[in-house]
Design a protein with these regions (language model features):
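A glycine- and charged-residue-rich anion-binding loop/surface
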Residues: 40, 64-68, 72, 89-90, ...
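RNA-binding accessory domains that recognize and position tRNA/RNA substrates
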Residues: 25, 30, 517, 547, ...
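Hard-cation-handling environments
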Residues: 224-354, 358-383, 387-527, 531-543, ...
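His/Asp/Glu-rich metal-coordinating catalytic cores
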Residues: 26-94, 99-311, 330-344, 363-367
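N-terminal amphipathic/basic-hydrophobic helices that include classical n-h-c signal peptides
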Residues: 1-24
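Conserved hydrophobic residues forming the short capping helix/wall of the S-adenosyl-L-methionine
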Residues: 132, 427, 562
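C-terminal tails and terminal domains of large nucleic-acid-associated
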Residues: 543-579
């Protein structure tokens, strides 16, 4: 009887699990946790934590570009407080591909948590290594893998599965855990005619489905788009049409990371006897890395320096450049405003913008197109022209992925909230129980056993803003001040008072920036000065001599008056000088 009780107790708390040929003993009390730190309810800064017991792996560490109201902010990265609190438990960072929204935060993460092994495919790590060196971060712990490779990290075994995307060498992940299998698709689509001839690995996903998948995390970016995403190869057909019609130079702007797109430009240039010049720092870096690693095939005599373009007839030159998003300092944008010192737009140039605007960049792209047209260029843009296709799976491809993997639980990831909801409904429409689908949010802790999934808590999460060299030192209060300055300007009120605060020794003087032009608003400024004087005298009459109280009264008095007269609320900065 005692033996039976002991055996029952052991069975209750301990189980034996065959795992990659080895046997592991694990306490059932330990749960599998999945914690998104970015990439849900937003486009960008993708980052997901997988935890079992005292072992953690991190999937991707991306950045996002600032929203319009984030004035002066350069980049946004995930809040990694949870990782800092558990840094001794992190066994590895595994990367799905080399886009900035998946690797861009790593220079900041690895500076704070060094010596973590980072695994990714060769192109992914080639791009990342350059980013780390630019930021002075050690790159010695990068470990390249190939599609089909399997690595061990703590209690996890991670497999890398080839997928098609708008960058070469992308992969999905299979993650064996003591609780069951997790599949993460990464950013993917099913391209049946890929440029490099390497399709998404259907068999690998199907085999995982046959063996049993506990949780699927899948790309939701195009969950609202019906049908199938066109093949990348169709862009090459559109390029050929444009090359055939072009009489002068061709300038093509695309994402620097889209190596297959660049390859199609090169192939078409060879066919039409045009030399290729590369413009833009990130474009030059990625092209050099891709040639070195063998992802981009370009005959040596095809590539010319940008300084050599005037040595060839215009109809024998094609320039591949950055600037497809209308970024203010990008090469194409500077060309559009005649501010590029090496390339000027000539009437008759054909400009191909081989990308669609990232949400929030529409105005920048539109302005660039207008400026190019004003200079006499022929501009080809927009999805209808066939010169761009998405790198993300549309609805029919998402259905295919679900049917291949057949998971017990599903977490839609990588998309704004409406994308995630659409993907969740799609999964439900093809037979997944609603209670097994988790529409999660950043910071939520999702906990799974073999039979049940639930939200069990929340960890610190959010956005860390990067402004120049400052990481996280700009918060909501600073942004609020910047917004106020950008909308209604600032008034600086300078008053000189005696040390004891008994009388005004000089002033007040008012300096205005971004509010009104003082010389054209003298009456307004004089009355404002009188309001300041009255506010100070009121304080002195009531024996109020604390500078902070006097400053607050000045702010309120002048703010009230200016709003009455102008319906504007400038930032008011009182300065009291002692004599």
């Amino acid at each position: 009887m005692q033996v039976k009780i002991l055996t029952s107790t052991i069975r209750k708390y301990i189980y034996k699990y065959k795992f990659g040929g080895a046997f592991f003993l694990a306490k059932e009390a330990q749960k599998l946790q999945i914690i998104p730190l970015g990439g849900l309810g937003e486009i960008g800064k993708n980052m997901t934590v997988v935890r079992y017991g005292d072992d953690i792996i991190v999937i991707d560490a991306g950045l996002m570009f600032p929203e319009e109201e984030m004035l002066g902010i350069d980049l946004v990265i995930p809040d990694i407080t949870y990782l800092l609190e558990n840094k001794d438990k992190i066994k590895a960072i595994v990367l799905t591909h080399g886009h900035e929204d998946h690797i861009g935060a790593l220079p900041y993460v690895l500076r704070q948590i060094p010596n973590i092994p980072v695994y990714g495919t060769r192109l992914t790590l080639g791009i990342l290594e350059g980013r780390l060196k630019e930021n002075g971060v050690d790159s010695s712990n990068l470990h390249p893998v190939y599609h089909g490779d399997i690595i061990s990290a703590g209690c996890f075994t991670v497999g890398f599965i080839r997928v098609n995307h708008s960058i070469a060498d992308a992969c999905g992940l299979s993650i064996k855990t003591p609780m069951g299998m997790i599949v993460h698709t990464g950013d993917f689509k099913f391209d049946y005619t890929p440029v490099d001839g390497k399709m998404t690995d259907f068999r690998a996903f199907s085999d995982l489905g046959n063996r049993g998948v506990l949780v699927l995390l899948a790309d939701s970016t195009n969950a609202e788009r019906e049908g199938h995403t066109p093949s990348e190869r169709t862009v090459g057909i559109a390029f050929e049409k444009a090359f055939r019609k072009a009489k002068n130079r061709i300038i093509i702007a695309t994402f620097s990371s889209n190596v297959h797109r660049i390859q199609q430009v090169v192939d078409t240039a060879i066919k039409y006897n045009r030399k290729v010049a590369i413009l833009g720092r990130s474009m030059i870096n990625v092209v050099n890395i891709s040639i070195k690693l063998g992802y981009l095939n370009m005959p040596e005599d095809m590539l010319i320096d940008i300084d050599e373009i005037n040595n060839y007839p215009m109809n024998q030159v094609v320039i591949i450049t950055t600037g497809s998003q209308g970024e203010p300092m990008s090469a194409l944008t500077r060309m559009s405003t005649a501010n590029h010192r090496k390339v000027g737009i000539v009437p008759g140039d054909t400009i191909i913008i081989s990308a669609t605007p990232i949400p929030g960049n529409e105005k920048l792209v539109s302005r660039t197109i207008d400026n190019l047209l004003k200079q006499g260029a022929d501009v080809i843009y927009g999805r209808d022209e066939g010169i761009h296709v998405s790198g993300h799976a549309s609805r029919e491809e998402l259905k295919l992925m679900h049917n291949l993997v057949r998971p017990k639980f599903f977490i839609p990831v990588h998309g704004e909230y409406h994308h995630i909801v659409k993907h969740a409904k799609l999964a439900e429409s093809i037979g997944m129980p609603k209670e097994n689908i988790f529409i999660s949010e950043i910071g939520q802790v999702l906990e799974f056993t073999r039979d049940k999934g639930q939200v069990v808590g929340k960890v610190t999460s959010g956005k860390v803003l990067i402004d120049g060299l400052g990481v996280g030192d700009v918060g909501n209060i600073v942004l609020r001040d910047r917004r106020q300055l950008s909308q209604d300007g600032i008034l600086i009120v300078v008053v000189t008072m005696d040390k004891e605060g008994r009388f005004i020794a000089a002033g007040p003087d008012i300096v205005s920036r971004g509010f009104v032009y003082v010389r054209e608003s003298e009456a307004l400024m004089e009355e404002a000065k009188e309001r300041v004087t009255s506010a100070i005298e009121h304080c002195l009459d009531n024996d109020i001599t604390e500078w902070s109280v006097i400053k607050n009264d000045i702010r309120e008095a002048i703010g009230r008056y200016l709003y009455e007269k102008t319906r504007r609320r400038p930032m008011i900065l009182p300065i009291i000088m002692e004599v």
